[in-house]
């Protein structure tokens, strides 16, 4: 037994290199186009790491921000803080985001993922081609004033066109533009419901019913107005069209 214990470290030292030799190493292979293709472990590591950035990409590089803010402002304008619930609004915003972003996703799949899966391009080229449709989408929704603001803050000088806008300037400019657009849409939504609140409050004051909360009386009229104008179809359709106009 003692001999076995004394020999065990030596056997372990001899077996370890053989065991690691069976594992696929971190290697790169040249591609026909002149690029390089990394081994499967590296690609798997990059893929798993990229999954952690999906929430940030969903929030900051898609139409999700504008949609969820508008839905939240609509709920406040109606005076129903818990209806629809957060889960319903998030689900509707996610599906609407997928619908709006589907042309961008299709372009990324065709231009970047398919050639990369067929080993026609390298991982770096796939990332560059996959980022291009997102850049074009964000540039269409970003105001020039916001781009100029962050370009001045970054001291990059005058930009020589859309292709010269770096991501570190485009991302905050896009988010700022989306916030402004969402609040503009929210202001438009608030106006008819605010008029109903003012009318109900004035009527209650004229009747001497100061103890009756105006929000309780105004809520049925707000819901009736929203249903009569087919508010959900109008709002969802306007949101979708705002990204293509």
Swiss-Prot record:
Membrane protein topology class: Multi-pass membrane protein
Q: Keywords of this protein's UniProt record, alphabetized?
A: Bacterial flagellum, Bacterial flagellum biogenesis, Bacterial flagellum protein export, Cell inner membrane, Cell membrane, Membrane, Protein transport, Signal, Transmembrane, Transmembrane helix, Transport
Q: Where is the signal peptide, in residue numbers? A: 1-21
**Superkingdom:** Bacteria
What is one Gene Ontology biological process annotated in the Swiss-Prot or TrEMBL record? Answer: chemotaxis
Q: Name one GO cellular component term.
A: bacterial-type flagellum secretion apparatus
Q: What is its main location?
A: membrane
Q: Which residues are listed as membrane-spanning?
A: 45-65, 88-108, 185-205, 209-229
Q: Where in the cell is it found?
A: Cell inner membrane; Bacterial flagellum basal body
InterPro entries in alphabetical order? FliP, T3SS_IM_P
Q: Name one Pfam family in it.
A: FliP
Family affiliation: Belongs to the FliP/MopC/SpaP family.
Cited function: Plays a role in the flagellum-specific transport system.
This chain belongs to the protein called Flagellar biosynthetic protein FliP
Q: Where is the organism placed in the taxonomic lineage, from the top?
A: Bacteria, Pseudomonadati, Pseudomonadota, Gammaproteobacteria, Enterobacterales
